[in-house]
Amino acid sequence: MTDFKLLEKLCTVEGISGDEGSVREIIINEIKPFADEIKTDNLGNIIVFKKGKNRAKAKLMLSAHMDEVGFMVTDITSDGYLKFDEVGGLDRRVVLGKTVTVGKNKVNGVIGVKPIHLSKSDERTAVPKYGEMYVSYTHLTLRTNSLG
């Protein structure tokens, strides 16, 4: 039987690169009943040991990423927009107009760029850099370096 609740939990928990603690906690809690030993190293990797029935057989290693790409708030403009930079490798061509959830208080926003009627002709066809994009949000409860 497939555990869709676990899959949903792992897919919806925040785990931006450098802040994977929530993902790590879920994984450890899920594998505890099956493990003989669980350790985390200085990089946050989970190392699990399970004794086999036959020591002569081959060893098995499972490896997977816990982190996900995201953004970090770098500035709040005087008119209240959030400036941000990428955390991980995100293609700038696909983020405009996307909804985002920012910070521990889960503030909702939308990624935007200077309106077309205020843009120069070369800006209208170029892919904007992250420094030219902003997040428009519903209310402010954020600080610089918030992850989201």
What are these regions (language model features)?
Residues M1-L140, S146:
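N-terminal hydrophobic/helix-forming segments and targeting peptides
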